[in-house]
């Protein structure tokens, strides 16, 4: 009995020992398994902070009128499955993940995609492949400064001071292989409900929906196929058949299994002024996802550690252990896609106007115009000297960036030592240019400022060296009178007016140093006419006075001549204008300005000298510059230096002479750059000359009427909608390369304001002004004395 008891105890002891050994082995194995998985998790995610910081947030914007269907988003997600890695050590490396986000702020709903920097190009190409009209801008590109690029903006911020936060994360309630309701089974675009909720954010509120996706392995498909197999097997056996899933549901499961799958988690964060408001918004967003309820549905999961959740949200961390469900490309497209014209929610940030890449054969040097930014690629745009000789026309509403564009080109020309003339009817452009004049070019500056009453510069309209120039001056003044007093050719200025003015001007020009003052005298002083007639060599002009005027009755003579003098009188009696046009010798020669590559800045500010005086001076200055250019006929083409003539609001100074500049000035190396606000400001002749001869057209934002006209210039790339909605400081350009036209493209003219400010030197500007007025102006007392002596006032 003792032996038997001993044997039983021994056996029990052995069994216990074996059990303890096995338990120890199991515990050890479990510990090893746990340690191994902890090690794997550490190995996978040890660098997730640096990976997060090295990601790029892309803002994706599409045109309001786009008709892209949701299928395009499904195509996009399917293509992103190519990121799935199948290397030998894939278990130890996390699959790359992307974050698709919708952000709602007061009156502003935007769409973003966060992508690891190394996959940025691939993702951008796939987005553009699915949504060709989409515009993609980096928001927080960490490599932007390293590449010498420009950071577009800062990352969005839904949080506010003293705001209350509500948050949640969601995944599927059921098995991964069970589908949710997809967009094909919904009557309306599911995105409409999402944007409607986000569009209700008030001041101090904000919400963000993050959808994090990561390519999934096929394990979920194996489980799903096993489920289908079991269901079909059971239904084939009448004793086991339960008919839990009908044929349509099984078809839906099979459809899901045929698609690419992504491990997915959805995070939602709301900030509001009160906790009640934040909770209400969060509940509304959660409710929106109920539209996808089918065989599966989204379930809100509890997050007990707020700090950890917010860290995951801000860094866009993918869940390390649990918290994901598998959604297919079709299901993801149902939840997230870019809006089209069917979404009418107010506040969506639409792409105002599409972009188009610049042609590859554009110049790589010359005058810098701006950047062409298209599909993530930015390149500088230049125009060569020979193509600039075909002139440039710039159009756009006020405040769209025209003047800044002009200023950028003018400054470059000045820095490059070019000859430049600028007519500015506002004054700000000239003042800005003076601030950046390099000291080495201070001597080249001629500042023509009519508002300088103390030292007026002389500008003699009547100066002419040849018979051709005399007739051109007469025609220019007659054109000026039509522009000012009879723009519609109603007869206010007619043939009799032209005939009298032309003969009066040609008569006084036989007396060297004559001015418009003398024209007034010859029209009113018969004694003065008799003094001049012996000097008049042209018999036709002489007979005008001896025959035609002499035989006209005093009544009709005074009627015609008084009418003419009344038109000229308003300028001659204006002391400021009289002290300028009444000087017998001009303060500077336009020909020398061009040949010696001077900087002529003409400040015709309407605010200081009046609109009528501004227009008058501009209308007499422009023809003089043309005469100077045409006088270059006496020098070989190779010796004619380029001179760049900039005119802002040029319609105020556009006479038929402008059409001649456009058609003939190129051969004289007078290159015109003009800007105005709308086409209707131009006369038909000028408009035809502009669009018939100008080589480069840059259109900033315009009105409906102009968009209709200009759309023909930019077809088929841009349409009326684009021209009406182009962003500020952006334009559409049509230009030449080697004299040949190229397709239109979008141009971003924004510049480094800080760099430009650093160039400004107010002290140099003041010195340049003073130097110019002392060098070219005359003391007002001497000017008035000379005019009084010559006019017998």
Give the positions of each predicted feature.
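C-terminal anchoring/interaction modules
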Residues: 741-744, 753-793
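Conserved nucleotide-binding/hydrolysis micro-motifs of P-loop NTPases
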Residues: 65-67, 120, 143, 216-218, ...
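Switch/connector loops and helix/strand junctions flanking conserved nucleotide-binding motifs
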Residues: 144-161, 165-169, 219-222, 278, ...
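N-terminal pre-Walker A segment at the start of P-loop NTPase domains
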Residues: 361-380
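P-loop NTPase motor domains
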Residues: 371-377, 385-387, 392, 397-398, ...
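Conserved ATP-driven motor cores of ASCE-family P-loop NTPases powering translocation/secretion/packaging/pilus
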Residues: 288-295, 321-327, 435-437, 451, ...
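Extended, folded cores of ATP/NTP-driven motor/assembly subunits in large transport
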Residues: 3-358, 453-456, 534-536, 548
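Short hydrophobic alpha-helical runs that function as membrane-insertion/retention elements
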Residues: 134-138, 393, 419-423, 444-448, ...
């Amino acid at each position: 009995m003792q032996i038997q008891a001993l044997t039983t105890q021994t056996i029990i002891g052995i069994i216990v020992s074996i059990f303890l050994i096995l338990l120890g082995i199991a515990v050890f194995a479990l510990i090893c398994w746990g340690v191994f998985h902890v090690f794997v998790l550490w190995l996978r995610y040890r660098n997730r902070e640096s990976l997060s910081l090295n990601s790029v947030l892309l803002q994706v914007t599409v045109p309001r009128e786009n008709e892209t269907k949701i299928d395009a988003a499904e195509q996009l997600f399917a293509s992103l499955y190519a990121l799935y890695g199948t290397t030998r050590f894939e278990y130890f490396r996390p699959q790359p993940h992307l974050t698709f986000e919708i952000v709602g702020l007061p009156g502003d709903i935007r769409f973003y995609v966060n992508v690891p920097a190394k996959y940025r190009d691939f993702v951008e190409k796939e987005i553009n492949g699915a949504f060709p009209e989409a515009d993609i801008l980096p928001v927080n590109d960490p490599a932007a400064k390293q590449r010498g690029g420009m950071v577009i903006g800062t990352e969005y911020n839904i949080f506010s001071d003293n705001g209350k936060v509500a948050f949640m994360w969601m995944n599927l309630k059921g098995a991964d292989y069970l589908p949710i309701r997809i967009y094909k089974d919904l009557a309306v675009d599911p995105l409409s409900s999402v944007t409607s909720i986000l569009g209700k954010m008030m001041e101090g509120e904000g919400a963000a929906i993050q959808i994090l996706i990561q390519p999934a392995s096929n394990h979920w498909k194996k489980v799903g196929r096993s489920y289908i197999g079991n269901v079909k097997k059971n239904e084939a056996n009448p004793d086991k058949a339960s008919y839990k899933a009908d044929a349509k549901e099984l078809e839906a499961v099979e459809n899901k299994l045929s698609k690419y799958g992504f491990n997915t988690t959805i995070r939602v964060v709301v900030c509001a002024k009160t906790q009640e408001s934040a909770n209400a918004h969060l509940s509304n967003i959660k409710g929106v996802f109920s539209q996808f309820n089918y065989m599966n549905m989204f379930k809100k999961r509890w997050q007990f550690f707020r700090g950890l959740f917010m860290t995951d949200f801000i860094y866009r961390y993918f869940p390390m252990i649990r918290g994901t469900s598998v959604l297919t490309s079709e299901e993801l497209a149902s939840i997230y896609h870019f809006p089209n014209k069917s979404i009418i929610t107010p506040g969506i940030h639409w792409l105002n106007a599409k972009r188009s890449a610049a042609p590859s054969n554009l110049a790589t040097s010359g005058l810098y115009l701006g950047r062409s930014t298209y599909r993530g690629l930015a390149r500088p745009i230049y125009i060569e000297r020979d193509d600039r000789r075909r002139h440039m026309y710039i159009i756009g509403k006020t405040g769209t960036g025209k003047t800044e564009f002009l200023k950028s080109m003018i400054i470059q020309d000045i820095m490059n030592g070019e000859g430049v003339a600028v007519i500015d009817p506002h004054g700000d452009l000239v003042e800005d240019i003076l601030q950046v004049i390099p000291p080495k070019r201070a001597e080249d500056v001629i500042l023509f400022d009519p508002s300088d009453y103390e030292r007026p510069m002389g500008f003699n309209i009547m100066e002419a060296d040849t018979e051709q120039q005399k007739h051109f001056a007469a025609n220019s003044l007659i054109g000026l009178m039509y522009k000012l007093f009879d723009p519609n050719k109603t007869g206010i200025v007619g043939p009799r007016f032209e005939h009298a003015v032309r003969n009066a001007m040609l008569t006084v020009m036989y007396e060297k140093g004559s001015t418009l003052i003398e024209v007034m005298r010859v029209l009113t002083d018969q004694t003065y006419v008799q003094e001049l007639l012996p000097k008049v060599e042209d018999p036709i002009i002489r007979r005008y006075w001896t025959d035609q005027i002499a035989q006209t009755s005093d009544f009709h003579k005074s009627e015609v001549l008084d009418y003419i003098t009344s038109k000229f009188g308003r300028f001659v009696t204006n002391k400021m204008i009289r002290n300028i046009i009444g000087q017998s010798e001009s303060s500077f020669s336009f020909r020398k300005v061009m040949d010696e590559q001077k900087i002529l800045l003409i400040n015709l500010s309407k605010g200081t000298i009046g609109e009528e005086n501004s227009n008058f001076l501009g209308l007499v200055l422009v023809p003089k510059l043309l005469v100077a250019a045409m006088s270059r006929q006496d020098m070989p083409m190779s010796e004619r230096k380029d001179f760049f003539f900039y005119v802002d609001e040029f319609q105020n100074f556009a006479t038929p002479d402008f059409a001649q500049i456009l058609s003939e000035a190129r051969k004289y190396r007078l290159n015109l750059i003009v800007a105005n606000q709308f086409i209707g400001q131009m006369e038909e002749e000028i408009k035809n000359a502009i669009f018939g001869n100008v080589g480069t057209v840059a259109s900033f934002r315009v009105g409906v009427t102009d968009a209709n006209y200009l759309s023909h210039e930019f077809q088929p790339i841009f349409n009326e909608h684009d021209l009406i909605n182009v962003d500020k400081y952006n334009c559409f350009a049509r230009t030449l390369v080697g004299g040949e036209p190229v397709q239109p493209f979008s141009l971003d003219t924004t510049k480094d304001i800080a760099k430009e400010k650093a160039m400004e030197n107010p002290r140099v500007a003041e010195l340049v002004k003073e130097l110019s007025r002392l060098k070219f102006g005359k003391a007002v007392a001497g000017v008035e004395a000379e005019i009084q002596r010559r006019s017998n006032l």
